[in-house]
A protein has these predicted regions:
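A short glycine-rich, His/Asp/Glu-containing loop-to-beta-strand
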Residues: 1-28, 32-35
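Glycine-rich beta-strand-centered segment in the early N-terminal region that forms part
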Residues: 27-29, 51-54
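Short, conserved beta-strand element in jelly-roll/cupin
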Residues: 15-19, 30-48, 87-90
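A generic "binding-loop/recognition-motif" signal
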Residues: 22, 54, 70, 78-80
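Short acidic-glycine-tyrosine-enriched beta hairpin
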Residues: 52-69
Length: 111
């Protein structure tokens, strides 16, 4: 659910809620300068993972800083709803690239 209007507010904010077991695909926030994303965890429990790194358990009050050009995914744990505020960091030549799904094998191995 968007909290700001693109073109009216220079920073895009959205309230995002995942049902248990739901996660987004791997994706990248591209920018030639600046850019990236912030996740402000507000409810439930979730996961955040950067490519090649261990997944991080997320709980309310945590903030995740995701630099531009970092492939990652985020979503709910298998047994919990999860909500966060997504903040698109302003930058130049920004665009999102959606990649492959997070496999069930990778996701279920997280516990």
């Amino acid at each position: 659910k968007p909290l700001t209007t693109p073109g009216v507010c220079p920073v895009f904010l959205a309230n995002v809620t995942f049902e248990p077991g739901c996660r987004n695909n791997w994706h990248i926030h591209h920018a030639s300068k600046g850019g990236g994303q912030l996740l402000i965890c507000t409810a439930g429990e979730g996961w955040y993972q950067e490519e090649g790194k261990r997944a991080v358990s997320l709980t309310p009050g945590m903030v995740v800083t995701i630099p531009a050009e970092v492939k990652h995914w985020h979503g709910a744990k298998a047994n919990s709803w999860f909500s966060h505020i997504a903040v698109e960091v302003p930058g130049e030549n920004t665009r999102n690239e959606w990649c492959e799904p997070v496999s069930d094998e990778v996701y279920t191995a997280l516990g």
